[in-house]
């Protein structure tokens, strides 16, 4: 079919949420002429749910996005109202940063960044169809009949695909925050042959700040110690005038109100059909599932400096409006609170992610990529991470360059994508530290050491960032080498000082690095014995040194595991393999292999329902040029 295109682009990104923004910035910065199409320009990088960025595992993803040259970290560092490091009482593997955002300022700043980006056109328009010829993308069709040519298309439509808002018995077609739903595009994706699922998420009511009795709640301040998401942010710019959050709880009265109105709850009346998020359940779901709990935490989170809206975190609901009012007024501190917005549920279509490659390109259609909630994930951070990788790979494909696949040992982003494409998801997917088997090497503090060189190689890390990274890496390497070269001997003068500090004396000579492995010895104490570094070290370098030294044994074990898995990841499986030709593998394994079509032995080994015997048979088959027999 011959198309009359009115405009031509290298890459078209559909949807300007957190995934779409990262995808379009990546492609344009890598030199591709890019169109970012959105239903509503005023909702670019909008936060329709929680006014925050980061959190457990998610905060590390934001650091990874920044290390690769993405935008989310820099943008939140310019627009936060509170910053807090989580899990400081636990080990370094689970520490993560979380920021309360000024949500309107966050969106405005990101829009400004997009508007001034070279090679990037921002357009308010609705895309109805993705145009495909001979199994590859050639462009898109707008609702107004315009055809735009493209060599690659990235779908980042969030919850807009056939979106429906549900509030009590009210149900209507809508995207998030009462924006337009994208129904025709949802139909088009199904017609193209993609398998579609249906998920649900929700959001809590917003209440008026001046109507809250804060005396009845517990203050939750931010941190005094400077922290940032972007490796380029300076401690001197750390916000001193932070806005606190507040903690309150549900109570028995709250639970009674919910229980008495369960028959009116869309989740229980049958109105809601989509699968909801396991790790962010509605309050009515929590009351039913955890009936033995006397109360549930609720955090009151300001949505910005210049708004009265306060987000009631933990109270996600689609109960009728009158029930929501009664529920709010049953909570300590909210007895007289004014509800400014009701909570609601939203159902939406997703592309089942087992149909994707690890590049986030669909297996079915060449040049078609999907990212974010379109792939069944929840959360701004998960969306942004996918958007960045989809954008990078769309640009690399257009340019005829080698693709980028982040492994599970490279990044949390790699863990997430591997989970999605290998295991799929039956519910909105959320990243957790427990999903990462190599979490000790996927830390908040070393994201730049892991990923900045990759970002530089693909063209997203500019000269300023690269120079700063090289300085940091050299300082780290030099100081680690110095600490490993200086010996502390168990002489009287040294041991007298050690004992004065209340520590056990040395019995053998050891390096300063070995001395630092003692739990009680930090960097400051170590250098008081061996002298300071040749140049002043940033606090973040010192933190990195302490972690790498104290956990060296565990880190080495993890790296050994990575090396073993790497050998499996390097064993490729032909794309045209005939799974029916492999004798003796279990029926379940054969079915899963056909569905997922894994690209490596490593990926095949992680598929649910596949056992080691199946992998052994597969490897024998591949090594024997297509012949596999069970050995007895």
Swiss-Prot record:
Keywords: Cytoplasm, FAD, Flavoprotein, NAD, tRNA processing. FAD binds at residues 15-20, 127, 182, 373. One of its GO terms (biological process) is tRNA wobble uridine modification. SUPFAM superfamilies: FAD/NAD(P)-binding domain. NAD(+) binds at residues 276-290. Its main location: cytoplasm. The gene is mnmG. One of its GO terms (molecular function) is flavin adenine dinucleotide binding. The lineage of its organism: Bacteria, Bacillati, Bacillota, Bacilli, Lactobacillales. Belongs to the MnmG family. Homodimer. Heterotetramer of two MnmE and two MnmG subunits. NAD-binding protein involved in the addition of a carboxymethylaminomethyl (cmnm) group at the wobble position (U34) of certain tRNAs, forming tRNA-cmnm(5)s(2)U34. It is found in: Cytoplasm. GO terms for cellular component: cytosol. InterPro entries: FAD/NAD-bd_sf (IPR036188), GIDA_C_N (IPR049312), MnmG (IPR004416), MnmG-rel (IPR002218), MnmG-rel_CS (IPR020595), MnmG_C (IPR026904), MnmG_C_subdom (IPR047001), MnmG_C_subdom_sf (IPR044920). It comes from the Bacteria. PANTHER family: GLUCOSE INHIBITED DIVISION PROTEIN A (PTHR11806), PROTEIN MTO1 HOMOLOG, MITOCHONDRIAL (PTHR11806:SF0). Its cofactor is FAD. This is tRNA uridine 5-carboxymethylaminomethyl modification enzyme MnmG.
């Amino acid at each position: 079919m011959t198309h009359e295109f009115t405009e031509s682009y290298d890459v078209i990104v559909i949807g300007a949420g957190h995934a779409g923004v990262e995808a379009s910035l990546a492609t344009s910065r890598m030199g591709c002429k890019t169109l970012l199409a959105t239903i509503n320009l005023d909702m670019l990088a909008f936060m329709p749910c929680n006014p925050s960025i980061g959190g457990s595992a998610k905060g590390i993803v934001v650091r990874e996005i920044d290390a690769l040259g993405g935008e989310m970290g820099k943008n939140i560092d310019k627009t936060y109202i509170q910053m807090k490091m989580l899990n400081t009482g636990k080990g370094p593997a689970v520490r993560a940063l979380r920021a309360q955002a000024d949500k309107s300022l966050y969106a405005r700043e990101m829009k400004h960044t997009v508007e001034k980006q070279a090679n990037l056109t921002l357009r308010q328009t609705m895309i109805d169809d993705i145009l495909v010829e001979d199994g590859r993308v050639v462009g898109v069709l707008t609702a107004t009949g315009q055809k735009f040519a493209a060599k690659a298309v990235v779908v980042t439509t969030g919850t807009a695909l056939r979106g429906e808002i549900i509030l009590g018995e009210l149900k209507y077609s809508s995207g998030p925050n009462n924006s337009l739903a994208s129904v025709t595009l949802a139909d088009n994706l199904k017609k193209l042959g993609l398998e579609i699922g249906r998920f649900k998420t929700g959001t809590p009511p917003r209440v008026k700040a001046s109507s809250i009795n804060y005396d009845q709640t517990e203050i939750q301040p931010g941190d005094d110690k400077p922290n940032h998401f972007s490796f380029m942010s300076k401690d001197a710019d750390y916000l001193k005038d932070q806005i606190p959050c507040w903690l309150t709880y549900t109570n028995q009265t709250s639970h009674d109100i919910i229980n008495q109105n369960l028959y009116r709850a869309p989740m229980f009346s049958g109105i809601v059909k989509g699968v909801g998020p396991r790790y962010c359940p509605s309050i009515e779901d929590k009351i039913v599932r955890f009936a033995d709990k006397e109360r549930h935490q609720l955090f009151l989170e300001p949505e910005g400096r210049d708004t009265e809206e306060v987000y009631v975190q933990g109270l996600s609901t689609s109960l009728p409006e009158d029930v929501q009012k009664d529920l709010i007024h049953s909570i300590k501190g909210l007895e007289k609170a004014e509800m400014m917005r009701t909570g609601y549920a939203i159902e939406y279509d997703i592309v089942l992610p087992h149909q994707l490659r690890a590049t986030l390109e669909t297996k079915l259609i060449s040049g078609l990529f999907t990212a974010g909630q379109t792939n069944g994930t929840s959360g701004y951070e998960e969306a942004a991470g996918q958007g960045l990788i989809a954008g990078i790979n769309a640009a690399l494909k257009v340019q005829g360059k080698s693709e980028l696949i982040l492994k599970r040992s490279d990044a949390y982003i790699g863990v997430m994508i591997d989970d999605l494409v290998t295991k799929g998801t039956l519910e909105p997917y959320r990243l957790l530290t427990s999903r990462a088997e190599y979490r000790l090497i996927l830390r908040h503090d070393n994201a730049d050491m892991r990923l900045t060189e990759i970002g530089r190689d693909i063209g997203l890390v500019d000269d300023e960032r690269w120079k700063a990274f090289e300085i940091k890496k050299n300082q780290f390497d030099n100081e680690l080498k110095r600490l490993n070269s200086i010996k502390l001997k168990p002489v009287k003068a040294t041991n007298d000082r050690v004992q004065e500090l209340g520590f056990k004396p040395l019995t053998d000579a050891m390096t300063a690095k070995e001395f630092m492995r003692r739990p009680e010895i930090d960097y400051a104490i170590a250098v008081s014995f061996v002298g300071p570094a040749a140049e002043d070290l940033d606090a973040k370098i010192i933190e990195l040194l302490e972690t790498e030294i104290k956990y060296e044994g565990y880190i080495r074990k993890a790296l050994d595991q990575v090396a073993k898995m790497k050998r499996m990841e390097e064993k490729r499986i032909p794309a045209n393999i005939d799974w029916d030709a492999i004798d003796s593998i279990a029926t379940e394994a054969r079915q899963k292999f056909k569905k997922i079509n894994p690209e490596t032995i490593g990926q095949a080994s992680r598929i649910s329902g596949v056992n080691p015997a199946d992998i052994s048979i597969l490897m024998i088959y591949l090594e024997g040029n297509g012949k596999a027999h069970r050995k007895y």
